[in-house]
Regions:
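Sequence-structural signature of mature extracellular/luminal beta-sheet repeat domains
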Residues: 1-355
Length: 355
């Protein structure tokens, strides 16, 4: 597989030969955050040439997109809403067909949110590890708790302090069905003693068996009637047999897979990272298999069970991808960085209204 190798500021990156054509075939683009400081947009120019645009966005972590028109981005202590300012069929002078402009921010606190989504009612909900619950944005409070695991000690109130490290949620028809967690611990930092095989996927309604024995699981997602999951500490991506409560690996990669989104019927984008530092992560199975961990966006062919295309990142600053969203129908998205001078000058005006 031949590659295109390029350099972008403190990062170097390489694209597999077929990635450009695949983006055109699927008519999509990808946004992802790296190292909590940059947002990248992987897309195409009007002539089809692949592009990677880089935006300073300090403390950018989890993100999600709605209808390729709205972005929600978690930064250090806020959730931002960004809206596309371009009418359909219009582009910027540089050829971008989406321009996401910051519109509002909700202050939630330093919660370490790894996953967020819109529910069936259009509300922003998110995984809240710092308080061991699923939460919703609230107009009065920093957040409103919606659910906590049954093993937590106080069912009528949330517990402050990361006990089990909730890591992801699966929604079906806009309702949460499953939640992933590093451990089933009711005590603060208890998850750190269960990293090897204490991970779990819980059916929040209790209709199916929990999936046990996982290693730092992330990003449970429904797709075409099947539940998929990242077993991040082993580098595995696979399906969940919800009837038997069993994780069935489909492929393994040499990276800590944290983010997942599906594109069309047959493909999934996986975000692989260098495993986290720290003594508690030193003995992860991913570190013991002999393969050098990579930082990359990997396009998995679900029918073949293999990686079809890659965008790989190199250099000392290419380490962790924290959030990723696919934008179907968007060829080359751009955004106005949250703390740039441009945010003061990009002004969008609606139609005249009656007073």
């Amino acid at each position: 597989m031949s590659n295109t190798f390029l350099e972008l500021r403190e990062y170097q990156y390489a694209f597999s030969a077929g990635l450009e054509g695949w983006l055109a075939q699927e008519n999509t683009s990808l946004l992802f955050s790296m190292n909590g400081k940059n947002l990248f947009a992987l897309g195409r120019k009007a002539d089809g040439q692949i592009t990677l645009d880089d935006y300073d966005c300090e403390h950018a972590f989890a993100l999600t997109a709605a209808q390729s028109q709205t972005l929600y981005l978690f930064t250090r202590f806020q959730i931002w809403r960004m809206e596309n300012a371009l009418p359909a069929g219009h582009t910027t002078d540089a050829g971008h067909d989406r321009l996401f402009v910051p519109k509002s921010a909700n202050t939630v606190g330093r919660l370490g949110i790894p996953d967020l989504a819109l529910d069936a009612d259009g509300a922003v909900i998110f995984i809240n590890p710092g308080f061991n619950c699923i939460s919703r944005l609230d107009e009065r409070y920093n957040f409103a708790p919606l659910w906590q695991p049954p093993f937590m000690p106080t069912p009528d109130r949330v517990t402050k302090g990361d006990c089990c490290h909730l890591s992801g949620m699966a929604l079906r028809e806009g309702r949460v069905t499953h939640v992933s967690s590093y451990a089933q611990s009711p005590v603060v930092d208890g998850w750190k003693n269960a990293i090897q095989n204490g991970g779990v996927l819980l059916d929040i309604a209790g209709h199916s068996e929990p999936v046990l024995g996982l290693t730092m699981p992330h990003a449970p997602r429904w797709h075409n009637g099947q539940l998929w999951l990242m077993n991040s500490g082993t580098g595995e991506f696979g399906r969940v047999d919800v009837t038997r409560g069993v994780f069935e690996p489909v492929l393994r990669v040499s990276g800590f897979v944290r983010c997942l989104c599906f594109i069309g019927d047959h493909y999934a984008a996986l975000a692989a990272s260098i495993p986290p530092d720290g003594e508690e992560f030193a003995s992860l199975p991913l570190r013991q298999n002999g393969a050098k961990p990579t930082c990359a966006i990997l396009i998995a062919d679900l029918e073949r069970g293999e990686i079809a295309h890659t965008a790989s990142f190199f250099g000392k600053n290419a380490r962790e991808i924290f959030g990723m969203a696919a934008l179907p129908g968007a060829r080359r998205p751009a955004l106005v960085p949250l703390h740039s001078d441009a945010i003061q000058h990009v002004v969008t005006v609606g139609e005249m209204q009656n007073i």
